Amino acid sequence: MSGPHLVIVGCGDIGARVGLKLHTQGWSISALRRSVNALPSQFQGYAIDYTDPNALASLAYLCPDYVLFTPLPQGRDTAGYQRGFRDPLAVLGTIGWLQSNVGVVMVSSTRVFAERDGGWVTETSPLTTEDPSAVAIQQGEDIALSAPCNSPILRASGLYGELPGMLVERVRSGVFSSDPDRISNRIHRDDLADIAAGVLSKMAAGS
């Protein structure tokens, strides 16, 4: 019996890391991105723009068991965030990928929170209503959360670990902030991938 089938929508660095981890556990991995040349050879790649509704709908036949949505803004304005985060999830709903028999994990951002003064945030902290781009991300989250599917949302912040990277290079060169009390909220790419893979594995196990 084959393992679960995962479709990674917008498969960049994080998606590839997650897919490779799950592939070693017997999962079948399909990956959607504009260019498939950089995808791991273990993946079945589909060269599409996931923000193109018709292109995304054309792959409805894949019928995944699980979906990992790793979106990126398609521009710095609000419309770019809507195209990257909100609109594709609406399409996933129309093609049946948000039904109760599918598990969906979305990698979101802590940008959705209202806190801007360095305070602590939790899953229940207030969300911003003043940042239109963050609201567009929230709208994508809401589509997933209101769908029949099981849809955990991972709100990450400050990804690092892709070389060369500014944070790693600053540490290597001994560059420090002039503010000794400055706190940086970051997560390593491998850690985020481990979390996402762990969530998907638990979902597959019925947890």
Stretch-by-stretch model annotation:
Residues 43-65:
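Conserved Rossmann-fold cofactor-binding substructure of NAD(P)-dependent oxidoreductases
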Residues 59-105, 139:
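NAD(P)-cofactor binding segment of oxidoreductase domains
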Residues 128-131, 157-158, 162, 179-187:
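Glycine-rich "substrate-gating" loop/helix at the edge of Rossmann-like oxidoreductase active sites
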Residues 117-154:
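Catalytic helix-loop patch of NAD(P)-dependent Rossmann-fold dehydrogenases
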Residues 91-130:
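Conserved Rossmann-fold NAD(P)-dependent oxidoreductase catalytic core, especially the SDR/UDP-sugar
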Residues 15-16:
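N-terminal Rossmann-fold NAD(P) dinucleotide-binding loop
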Residues 135-138, 147, 159-172, 198-207:
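Glycine/proline-rich active-site loop of Rossmann-fold NAD(P)-dependent oxidoreductases
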Residues 166-168, 178-205:
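Substrate-positioning beta->alpha
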